Amino acid sequence: GLAGAISSVLDKLKQSQLIKNYAKKLGYPR
């Protein structure tokens, strides 16, 4: 349903945010 879709999108956003933070720690420009 709608709630499932929203929660899945939020999970993906969280994951990409974590990846960006990790990349910053490693010194990547992104």
Curated annotation (Swiss-Prot):
GO terms for cellular component: extracellular region. It is found in: Secreted. Keywords: Amphibian defense peptide, Secreted. One of its GO terms (biological process) is defense response. It comes from the Eukaryota. Expressed by the skin dorsal glands. The keyword Secreted applies. Its main location: secreted. This is Uperin-6.2.
